[in-house]
Amino acid sequence: MIQGIIGKKIGMTQIFQEDGKAQPVTLVEAGPCVVVQVKTEKQDGYEAVQLGYGKAKHITSAVKGQCRGFGEFKVLREVDVDDIAAVNVGDQITVSDFKDGEKIDASGVSRGRGFAGVVKRWHFAGGPKTHGQSDRHRAPGSISSTTTPGRIYKGKRMAGHMGNDAVTIRNLVVLKTDAEKNLLMVKGAIPGGKNTIILIKKTGK
């Protein structure tokens, strides 16, 4: 059985539980995906399947050959598989392979925030608002010492580009599936904004 699926983030909403509490949920349009390649231990050194998702506007000859006539896919991703012998090129993967209450890991690209200061990027407290301060309210403070070490240590938290990173959130719960509309309703938040490509894998797979 294939342990993942590719989808697109639709957005967030909320549902009300039996006790009346509101539960934030994320809607993901997952699949249908097509198996475009099966990788085996003998030929590739490991077992996995490559899935294709979405229709591409433009596609190179190399990718077209890789898709093997099953379509011009916008996204290609590899996922694990339990029984490689049961999977064939051309098989379709849909949300019906997931069950309500099942735990998943969701991977995507977080929303880009551009160039951000240390208060927004790293949650620094900033300087005091009074006692003679005029332009130090959101400043980083000291970033290193003097002659020794004479440099800034690697990994020092400073202002810079924020967001647009690959992020994986683990142990999310599938609350509901809709096979007709290819929808997964996932408890909580998933990385990225609307229309972000999301790779969903079953937790621990």
UniProtKB/Swiss-Prot annotation:
- InterPro entries reported for this sequence: Ribosomal_uL3 (IPR000597), Ribosomal_uL3_bac/org-type (IPR019927), Ribosomal_uL3_CS (IPR019926), Transl_B-barrel_sf (IPR009000)
The keyword Iron is annotated on this UniProt entry = no
The answer, when asked if Cell membrane is one of the entry's keywords, is no
Biological process GO terms, please? translation
Residue ranges, annotated region (Disordered) = 126-150
- Write out the entry's keywords from A to Z: Ribonucleoprotein, Ribosomal protein, RNA-binding, rRNA-binding
GO CC field: cytosolic large ribosomal subunit
One Pfam family, short name please? Answer: Ribosomal_L3
Q: Which Gene3D superfamilies match?
A: Translation factors
Domain of life here? Bacteria
> Which GO terms fall under molecular function for this chain's record?
rRNA binding; structural constituent of ribosome
List the signal peptide residues: none
Q: Which HAMAP family match?
A: Ribosomal_uL3_B
Q: What PANTHER family does this protein's entry cite?
A: 50S RIBOSOMAL PROTEIN L3, LARGE RIBOSOMAL SUBUNIT PROTEIN UL3C
Family label: Belongs to the universal ribosomal protein uL3 family.
**Physiological role:** One of the primary rRNA binding proteins, it binds directly near the 3'-end of the 23S rRNA, where it nucleates assembly of the 50S subunit.
| UniProt subunit comment | Part of the 50S ribosomal subunit. Forms a cluster with proteins L14 and L19.
Official protein name in the record: Large ribosomal subunit protein uL3
Q: Which gene encodes it?
A: rplC
